[in-house]
């Protein structure tokens, strides 16, 4: 049975009517037309669907809509724009960290959540945090450099 659920998406209040067990990813993509989070594995194992929920990177393909009720959700679209990318997005651009793009949403959203929590992470902390995001092209070195660059950019006055 459908129910109406209220949540915050990219700083805006949203009400969605759907089955409570509908994956949050489907609501974001199909109902709210937010295509930053991607459908990858559908099992929460690849990271392509990562969003930030209340400051924590989370896999939206395995979170039921009911589990997002009243929560603050940020998608890739909520970080920046083409004209003014978020510092993490800009760092990924500057370091040319993308090839096929499969992992970019998950890597960027996970990096943003990490840097919000730990402004100056070690390489080991960055690797540990990003290790659950599947990158098919192997741009791991560029991704690591991008996260380091984003951390440095945030430190500058």
Curated annotation (Swiss-Prot):
Involved pathway(s): Cofactor degradation; nicotinate degradation
Reaction catalysed by this enzyme: 2 Fe(III)-[cytochrome] + nicotinate + H2O = 2 Fe(II)-[cytochrome] + 6-hydroxynicotinate + 2 H(+)
SUPFAM superfamilies the record matches: 2Fe-2S ferredoxin-like (SSF54292), CO dehydrogenase ISP C-domain like (SSF47741)
Gene Ontology terms for molecular function: 2 iron, 2 sulfur cluster binding; metal ion binding; oxidoreductase activity, acting on CH or CH2 groups
Disulfide bond entries: none
EC number of the protein: 1.17.2.1
Enzyme class: oxidoreductase
Residues spanning the membrane: none
Induction text: Repressed by NicS in the absence of 6-hydroxynicotinate (6HNA) or nicotinate inducers. In presence of 6HNA, repression is alleviated.
Origin: domain of life: Bacteria
Cofactor note: Binds 2 [2Fe-2S] clusters per subunit.
Pfam families on file: Fer2, Fer2_2
Gene Ontology biological process terms from the UniProt entry: nicotinate catabolic process
InterPro entries, alphabetized: 2Fe-2S-bd, 2Fe-2S-bd_dom_sf, 2Fe-2S_ferredoxin-like_sf, 2Fe-2S_ferredoxin-type, 2Fe2S_fd_BS, Beta-grasp_dom_sf, Diverse_Oxidoreductases
Co-factor(s): [2Fe-2S] cluster
Residues binding [2Fe-2S] cluster: 41, 46, 49, 61
Disruption phenotype: Cells lacking both nicA and nicB lack the ability to hydroxylate nicotinate. Cells do not grow in a nicotinate medium but grow in a 6-hydroxynicotinate medium.
Key words of the record: 2Fe-2S, Aromatic hydrocarbons catabolism, Iron, Iron-sulfur, Metal-binding, Oxidoreductase
Segments forming domain 2Fe-2S ferredoxin-type: 3-79
Cited function: Subunit of the two-component enzyme NicAB that mediates nicotinate hydroxylation, the first step in the aerobic nicotinate degradation pathway. Mediates conversion of nicotinate into 6-hydroxynicotinate (6HNA).
Name this protein carries in UniProt: Nicotinate dehydrogenase subunit A
